Amino acid sequence: MLLEKNIPFKYVFGKIKYEITFVAVYAIFITVIYKAYELTHINIPFAVPSILGTVISLLLGFRSNQAYDRWWEARHVWGAIVNDSRTFARQLVSFTPSANNYVDSNLEAFKKRMINRQIGWCYCLGKHLRKQRTLQGLEKYFDKNELAYLKQTDNKPAAIVDLMARDLQLALDEGWINRFQQIELDRTLTRLCDAMGKCERIKNTVFPSTYSLYIHLAMMLFIILLPFSIIQFVGMFEVPLVIAISACFLLIEKMAIHLQDPFENKPTDTPMTAIAQTIDNNLTQLYLLNAAKEDRQTLSIFENYIENGIVFDRLDTSSNNRKNKSNQQQKEVKDDQYYVL
């Protein structure tokens, strides 16, 4: 996507270079013929191209609005994907038990697996909409069995959502989350699936080709008639004037054409890869910070127990101390060991 405010002049007019070349050649040809053969009797009233230009302006304005609405809806949907992805990760780390009251390697693997899947889903959806290789470069987010399953499916983003829904049911069966938490997480997945459907609707809904054809034909007619209307007033300046007026209409038309398809891997596209990278950074940081917080909580509780002498005690190596502790506690212990009082 174009992010710079100052777009190069070459880039802008590079989009209409062939059309402008045709207009320039045609305008020069009309000027030469008009002067060489003194075709002053060929005179088209200026009102004709004026009315035609007004109609074209209205049609181009309508088309530009429709194209921008499609582009803005695509950006709005991906903004919702960002929010729901963060919500999903937050729910995962907050709903599931923390390390200080539930220690289970399978639980930690579940949280990491779900967050990796969500990150991979965002990248995969962008590639899916652009009709690229959807799983290329995403091997680190899925294990071998998941990749083998995804390769067998046609709609890989939908298959990833299905994998996450199955894991939510597993978490419910294992007791890692309760029924209410499972419903809330499933609602977030449903919103993500809805966003995917909206993107696919925009992608697969083609802008009416007849509408574009009629506008283009009207513009060509306008360009053909315009030199005959102004050459008698401006003479040789007809060439740059026709080029300038035509360029305005052509640029607006090209802008609408590019905006109407926001998932075609063009500079004017919705920046899906950049958005997915933002989600990747946010979710990875959230998971790592939560894991570090749990480690600190566990260490803090451990140190607190040691300071208060509640759980752990250090045995002395001297025989007297061992005898005293043996009399007091009446328990058999070993040297240089920790034991529970």
For each feature predicted by the language model, list its residue ranges.
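Juxtamembrane loop-helix boundary motifs flanking transmembrane segments in multi-pass membrane proteins
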Residues: M1-F9, L60, V77, N106, ...
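Alpha-helical transmembrane anchor segments
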Residues: K17-I20, A24-E38, A47-P49, L59-R63, ...
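Short helix-terminus and kink motifs of transmembrane alpha helices
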Residues: F62-R70, R75, G79, A158, ...
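Intracellular alpha-helical coupling/juxtamembrane segments of multi-pass membrane proteins
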Residues: W71-F88, L185-M196, I202, K266-M272, ...
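Solvent-exposed, non-transmembrane helices and loops of integral membrane proteins
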Residues: S85-I119, F263-F312
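Structured inter-helical modules in multipass membrane proteins
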Residues: Q91-S209
